[in-house]
Amino acid sequence: MASDNDLFRVLVYDLAAAKGDIVMLPGRGEMIGGSGLAALLFAKYGEVAADALDPGQPIIFAIGPATGYFPLMSKTVAGFKSPYNGFYAESHAGGRSALALRFAGLDALVVVGRAKRPSVLVVGSRRLELLDTHYLWGADVFTTGKLLRKIAAGSSGHRSIMRIGPAGENGIGYACVNVDTYRHFGRLGLGAVMGAKNLKAVVVQGDADLPLPVDKGYAKLFKAIHEQVTSSGMMAKYHDLGTPANVLPLNELKSLPWRNMTATSDPEAAKISGEAFADELLMHNAACSGCPVGCIHIGMVREKFSDAHRFAIHQVAYDHEPNFAAGPMLGVTDPAEVLAINDMADRQGLDIISAGVALAWAVEATTKGL
């Protein structure tokens, strides 16, 4: 008979019934990481023939067995049927999501059904509640996050808020899920799946203790992994300029799409390079919980709100892919404008990569009078 250490501990929550149950599931020695667990759970709870937005389709948030125990293990895997392509999909996000699940005593959360009214699901080791939050429907992701930090109060270090914006509420096929402000479940429409379930947000409260291995071998292994990760040149690159460091090399290789892919390089690439963003707009770095790299780069967008030259400052996370979609794909070479476009898409809960590509087509079509 398998012990609890050999089993996955999964919370399965039915939004329609407003009820959840803990399921102990075998397979820990067979599945690889959060991806393996998410696939296993979709095979158990998913409906292959049903539409992606069918209430019976599950949303799965899963973590791997090393999460919480070793550095870098900071990603949660979301498994779902994609409204974008109609297939099983994975999306990965960090922030505090993975450690929050671990400190809530869970390997995975499975959400099925459709809530009667727009709702927020709050999950913790000692709390399970579905809140009627119809008043948040229509709110952007930043307003939603700000309010939920008060509504579902908890220790911010071990609390994760995964929420959608109007894009998800309206079933946009590439709506994403904002995770703790600066990270996202992007690309394949998880936001639309949450919207179809009347699920505005999931708040995970990591409110339990996490017993660590007591043998000396564990401490030595942890230290060795930490030292290897933090001393590598690749990790230094991600901490310094981040993925925007790729802009100039890609442009030189003629592999940087410009103006809806009508060109593959441009002499103005230096204006939107990683160096330019760092010199002009970078405010600070941030890190996902449990990760020593600190690869999240947060820039600033100034928004004028008074003729007397008064400005509000928005903090906007940036990476190469969002910058490419809101920059060279649109022919935009001002870093401040790139971040402003990123910020507008992010507020609505749109995947900026898909949104930028769609905008690039629209810009070219308009330019050509189509």
Where are these predicted regions, by residue range?
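Intrinsically disordered, low-complexity segments enriched in small residues
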Residues: 1-92, 96-370
